[in-house]
Amino acid sequence: MVSFLGGGLLGNPLSGALEEKEDKKEGDEEEDPEIAEAKREAEEKRNEKYRKMEEEREVMRQGIRDKYHIQKKELPKEDPGLEGRLGRKKKSPDEAVEGGDPLQSSAQSSGFPKNLDDLTAKVKELPGTVMTTVSGATDKCNLQ
């Protein structure tokens, strides 16, 4: 218990270690030019190594494409104006003449009537059609 109280009276025993650590941080900011040059050269070597490896892989890929007659996929180039755009892309004049939205054409060809009146008439006829079908089925069935 005396040592605990004495530590408080004498000061923080870790203060010396903290000062040394702060001194090391200041020394890291001013790096030796030789060390900086060595790091830069090592980074260049590493980048060159990976560049060579990628070139070798591309040669191998091209050999496989040639052997199996595979065409290299080319990504379509997009308009630079569309890069930050939130909405859909503008239609070209050819697309506008062809007939508009592909989603609308698929919805129209799905079997729904083109106008609302035909659809409502079919819905109104539906209960009668169901009743005739059910009554026809019950006539054919004999319950014993």
UniProtKB/Swiss-Prot annotation:
Its family remark reads: Belongs to the complexin/synaphin family.
Identify the propeptide residues: 142-144
Where composition is biased (Polar residues), the residues are 103-112
Q: In which tissues is it expressed?
A: Expressed in a subset of neurons in the central nervous system, including large serotoninergic Retzius neurons and pressure-sensitive P cells.
Annotated coiled-coil positions are 29-67
Q: Which InterPro entries match?
A: Synaphin
Subunit relationships:
Binds to the SNARE core complex containing SNAP25, synaptobrevin and syntaxin-1.
Protein name from the UniProt record: Complexin-1
Q: What is the lineage of its organism?
A: Eukaryota, Metazoa, Spiralia, Lophotrochozoa, Annelida
Q: Which organism is it from?
A: Hirudo medicinalis
The gene from which this protein is expressed is cpx1
Per UniProt, subcellular location reads as:
Membrane
Q: Outline the segment boundaries, as ranges, of region: Disordered.
A: 1-119
Here the segments flagged for biased composition (Basic and acidic residues) are 18-27, 36-86
